[in-house]
Amino acid sequence: ALSLGGQQWNNLSVVSAPSLNGTKIEAQGREVNATLLMRNHAPWLANIKYLYYNPGVAKTHASSPTPTSPLASANTISFRGWPDLQLRCEECWLWGQKYGRIDGDFAIKGNTLTLANGLIDTGFARLKANGEWVNAPGNERTSLKGSLHGSNLDTAAGFFGISTPIQNASFNVDYDLHWRNPPWQPEEATLNGILRTRLGKGEFTDLSSGHAGQLLRLLSFDALLRKLRFDFRDTFSEGFYFDSIHSTAWIKDGVLHTDDTL
């Protein structure tokens, strides 16, 4: 087994061969099945059929511990010599979590790394992203813009082990965010941007206690319309049904504001 990047790569075979305009590297093993085309005058292309990367799991000697993340020494990262890269991963597992399909086109210009056509598709939700990371000493900043959507919010959240009181609702979120620091270390006090959220028909659960849930079920405009359609689900249940929710929120220096949630 090969120890690299904080992980043991088992039954690994790596083959390198010249190609028409560069070099082709094929890697196959228990944790990876991938091909890398190192093209001479074009972005490198990484086609990954399967990747399981979980750094920190491999056992190491106490005197030489392995960092749990390759980003632990992020303050030393330099883009000098980095190639532009087109990433296509059909099935990716990262830090023990299945993410599914991951795509992205990465370009380097000076101290700036740009992401275009970013995509994470778990099968339950699709996250699209474009952005940039400026890695200038003393002026490091990140910006991301894109969308997140899926047909069922609680199923999409449950895929990552997260529970939500919103059930059976489709969701669409458009985001435009920026902050100081690298992408994986957002500084809360410098987080700014806009979130636009749209939820389809669904239900709030766990509203059975107190009078607030009863009042919502009785006076909600959506609930009144459903009663006109002879739909009395929320009258006899403990949840609160809604036909849609729309919200625009803006973040200023880490504080979320909204005044139009409907």
Where are the language model's segments positioned?
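Cytosolic ligand/metal-binding cores
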Residues: I162
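Short connector loops/turns at beta-strand edges and beta->alpha or beta->beta junctions
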Residues: H149-L153
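Flexible beta-edge/linker motif
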Residues: T35-Y50, Q185-E187
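Soluble, acidic/polar mature domains that operate outside membranes
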Residues: Y52-S63
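Solvent-exposed beta-strand/coil patches in large extracellular/periplasmic or lumenal scaffold regions
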Residues: A1-V32, S63-S147, N168-L262
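Extended non-catalytic domains of envelope/secretory-pathway proteins
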Residues: A156-G158
